Every structure is written in C-alpha cells, then in structure tokens.
C-alpha cells in the first residue's frame, strides 16, 4: 500500500486504497464515501432487554467523509482572496521542493503552467469547495479540496500531485 504524504509537512493526505484519478497532469481526484462514526452502544449485561435504554446514543453518531476522517484532516476556511494568497505561496514552496529533488526546468515549467490552469478552475467554482488542512494543521502545507460530483451526492477530494511524496507501507 502507498500512502501519499505532504512534501512540506509530512502529513498523510491520502492512500492508494482510494481510486486516484490524475486530472490535467497536476492534481489527483478521489471519490469518497460518507461514513457514520460514533453512536455505538454496547449491552454488557446478561439481559439486555431488561436494561434501561440509554437515551441520546444515536445523537453521538456523526456522518463524516471517509478520507477526511481516516487521515484526520481538519476543516478550515478561506475567502477567495485569502485562498489565492495561500496558493501563490504554496505553489512557490512546491516549485522549490521540485528543484531540491533535482527536477529539470521542463518539469518545473510544466508544473507551473498546469497548476496555473487548474487554479483558474478552482477559482471559477470557489464557492463549491470545502477546505481541509493536514493533521498538523500547518498553514503552509497542502490544502485538500472537497467538492461534490454532478449528482450532488458523491463527495470527492482534490490534491496537488506535485505536493505529494509516496511512502510504501
């Protein structure tokens, strides 16, 4: 199994157990599912029907997005201007990371061109996205984007391909 970590923070972002689709050569998208966590009730007595029913047990159950829950991502917020400011700094950091890894100029130029194009897509649909940081909540790390498919039901995440490094487990 491969786990993809943020190259800037080391936070685990996603794994290959999700069907990652490369989009425009610059991001991965992965469909998610909604899961229910919490709300479990365990009867420990011999006669469960005679025990008092605990009220409110169902209230503690929450619906979460599996990727967000599994990788302990934290919701954050942005306005359009704030996101653009963040994205500019993040792209520079990823570009520097590519240089440190020894990427050639053509690869870096390709990344810049494709990232700029995809950023325009994000901004044009900005109001549709939810934003998540990695577990460390480091503001310089990757912001994972959550949106819903055209059916309005299926959530999916978008992560920057060049901002990830593989870790085999």
Curated annotation (Swiss-Prot):
Gene3D superfamilies named among the record's database cross-references: Metal Binding Protein, Guanine Nucleotide Exchange Factor, Chain A
InterPro entries assigned: Mss4-like_sf (IPR011057), Mss4/transl-control_tumour (IPR011323), TCTP (IPR034737), Translation_control_tumour_CS (IPR018103), Translational_control_tumour_p (IPR018105)
GO cellular component, one term: microtubule
Keyword tags: Allergen, Cytoplasm, Cytoskeleton, Microtubule, Protein biosynthesis
UniProt subcellular location: Cytoplasm, Cytoskeleton
Gene Ontology MF terms: calcium ion binding
Top-level taxon: Eukaryota
Residue stretches making up the TCTP domain: 1-169
Major localisation: cytoplasm
GO aspect biological process, one term: cytoplasmic translation
Protein role: Involved in protein synthesis. Involved in microtubule stabilization.
Family that this chain belongs to: Belongs to the TCTP family.
Protein name per UniProt: Translationally-controlled tumor protein homolog
Phylogenetic lineage: Eukaryota, Fungi, Dikarya, Ascomycota, Pezizomycotina
């Amino acid at each position: 199994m491969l786990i993809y970590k943020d190259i800037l923070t080391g936070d685990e972002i996603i794994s290959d157990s999700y069907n990652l689709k490369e989009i425009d050569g610059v991001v991965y998208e992965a469909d998610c599912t909604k899961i229910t966590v919490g709300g479990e009730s365990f009867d420990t007595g011999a006669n469960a029907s005679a025990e008092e029913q605990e009220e409110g047990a169902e209230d503690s159950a929450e619906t979460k997005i599996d990727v967000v829950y599994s990788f302990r991502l934290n919701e954050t917020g942005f306005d359009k201007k704030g996101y653009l400011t963040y994205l500019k700094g993040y792209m520079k950091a990823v570009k520097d990371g590519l240089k440190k890894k020894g990427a050639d100029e053509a690869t870096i130029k390709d990344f810049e061109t494709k990232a700029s194009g995809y950023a325009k897509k994000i901004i044009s649909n900005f109001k549709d996205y939810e934003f998540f940081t990695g577990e460390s909540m480091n503001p310089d790390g990757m912001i994972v984007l959550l949106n819903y498919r055209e059916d309005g039901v299926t959530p999916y995440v978008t992560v920057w391909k060049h901002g990830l490094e593989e870790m085999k487990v």
